[in-house]
């Protein structure tokens, strides 16, 4: 999917993606932007954050499915304050996301191979 007004900061842990987004938030014209993250703050995203902190243990394939579900909510849903990216971008907001598709493809490929993450995310 190609989405106008959608900018993603990707990078390994500690690469500075969040730092760059914080710099953007301090701009005078920051109201033109809609800032978001993956995992989202939807219920699925909150569960994924617990998993990432080690509070919940899941099979890697299960987590791959949940990340794809959270990405769908991120793009189209209304289940969190940072969801509904497509609607925000189409309304003229510049959407800036801290992580997106390539993070899933990279991290999940390590734990469950290339094929499943690629198939789950091919529509994104």
Annotate each predicted stretch with a short phrase.
Residues 31-122:
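ATP-dependent small-molecule kinase phosphotransfer cores
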Residues 24-27, 51:
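Hydrophobic residues on the short alpha-helix immediately C-terminal to a glycine-rich phosphate/catalytic loop
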């Amino acid at each position: 999917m190609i989405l106008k007004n959608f900018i993603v900061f990707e990078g390994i842990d500690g690469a500075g993606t969040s730092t760059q987004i914080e710099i953007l938030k301090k701009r005078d014209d920051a109201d033109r932007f809609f800032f978001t993250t993956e995992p989202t703050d939807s219920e699925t995203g909150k569960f994924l954050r617990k998993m990432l902190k080690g509070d919940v243990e899941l099979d890697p394939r299960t987590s791959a499915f949940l990340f794809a579900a959270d990405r769908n909510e991120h793009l189209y849903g209304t289940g969190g304050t940072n969801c509904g990216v497509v609607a925000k971008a189409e309304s003229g907001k510049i959407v800036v996301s801290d992580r997106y598709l390539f993070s899933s493809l990279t991290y999940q490929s390590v734990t469950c191979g290339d094929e499943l993450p690629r198939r789950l995310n091919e529509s994104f």
